[in-house]
Amino acid sequence: MAAKIIDGKTIAQQVRSEVAQKVQARVAAGLRAPGLAVVLVGSNPASQIYVASKRKACDEVGFVSRSYDLPETTSEAELLELIDTLNADSTIDGILVQLPLPAGIDNVKVLERIAPDKDVDGFHPYNVGRLCQRAPRLRPCTPRGIVTLLERYNIDTYGLNAVVIGASNIVGRPMSMELLLAGCTTTVTHRFTKDLRHHVEHADLLIVAVGKPGFIPGEWIKEGAIVIDVGINRLENGKVVGDVVFEEAAARASYITPVPGGVGPMTVATLIENTLQACTEYHDPQGK
């Protein structure tokens, strides 16, 4: 069996086009365009690349994008003060603080300071709690983007055995909640899991997010499984690969996401969707 490739680039572009049309309709009706504030502290090269892609996506769909590039020496108090200012700004619908933050700044304190209805990354405990209670509002971007991919490919998830490899706050844990909502019987594995291979071999839907190149051998994949590879790893030769051995896995799976061009583009597309949702549902619903 040769797996069908789940093309995240194409789906992400569709999502962005849909958002752009809705923004045009808002502006044509005399309403304001959604506003996103992107905050970067320091000069981490990877963070700069991610932030640039988010700003570009904002411009593409017609959002008002505001950039705050702060020096590495910024104090926690200064960053919290900026967030308070943005929380009070009625033209800003979403606040994104790029992680990781420099040493000496408490990530949790910063993320919790963002108003929940402007938390377009979906990391605030309020939004994670809403997802856990089956009443989601703004949802964590990567897990929600993965669900969108499955939906757009008309993959019926109800009753599937889903296995999530990795239990991070950003992907693994919220992903497990999304999968429960999608009707899956869900297992989350982590560094203390015994006999990882056994879990992988029984997965109808496998989602891998550990950040280790080739961590899951293709021979572990169940015939006909759906494989979602969240990993983005750059090898010494410059090649970008996922957490799953792609060629071997693609020979056994029914669907698989490539790296790059699978999950990555969906994370930014979902951020854009969340910002539009924050604007239209919480801040400026039809200009009321």
Curated annotation (Swiss-Prot):
Signal peptide: none annotated. PROSITE patterns: THF_DHG_CYH_1, THF_DHG_CYH_2. One of its GO terms (molecular function) is methenyltetrahydrofolate cyclohydrolase activity. Pathway: One-carbon metabolism; tetrahydrofolate interconversion. Belongs to the tetrahydrofolate dehydrogenase/cyclohydrolase family. HAMAP family: THF_DHG_CYH. Homodimer. This is Bifunctional protein FolD. The gene is folD.
